[in-house]
């Protein structure tokens, strides 16, 4: 046998051993790793959608992998793609959906919808708060929804509970600012009613 033939046989045998020992799950796991380590190219958006579709077709996806993917897409400002993954997660792993999944899906949907609420977003917030009435992200967004609809007392109630449940000083400062806005609106409405 020639050296090329021996090398070829060793490569084939190594590939067989790799698949046999690690299984197809190992290859599928590598798909997620490749997704995170790739660099954007000229056709990034088209490739991103195709790559997400391919990842969602993998049978051995775990809820944690999908949650990490959706959360990373949300953090990267890829709201449409994040919403797509969260939606797939909820449809596929309904037994694993918690309050944070619903609130993150609501956030990505809200940002994807040009920061406008719709019935689906409000429903996601309600589901999140049903599972965890102290979910600060859902409370913050529900407060914003109430504020935009002139329900300043309800907004203030949401934000007070959210304030009790956030750890970040920046989040606390932001909540205090919007709470002050709600208090001003309540005072303005109170003065209108007394005149």
Spans of model-derived segments:
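TPR alpha-solenoid repeat register
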Residues: 65, 99-101, 138, 171-175
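Alpha-helical adaptor scaffolds
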Residues: 71-75, 81-132, 137, 141
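Canonical positions in the second alpha-helix
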Residues: 54-58, 89, 127-128, 161-162
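Terminal, low-structured helical/coil segments at or just beyond the last alpha-helical repeat
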Residues: 7-14, 161-195
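Amphipathic alpha-helical repeat scaffolds of TPR domains
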Residues: 24-37, 60-69, 95-112
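Register position in tetratricopeptide repeats
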Residues: 75, 111-114, 148, 181-185
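Long, contiguous interaction/recruitment modules in multidomain scaffold/adaptor proteins
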Residues: 1-58
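TPR-repeat structural position
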Residues: 45-48, 79, 115-118, 152
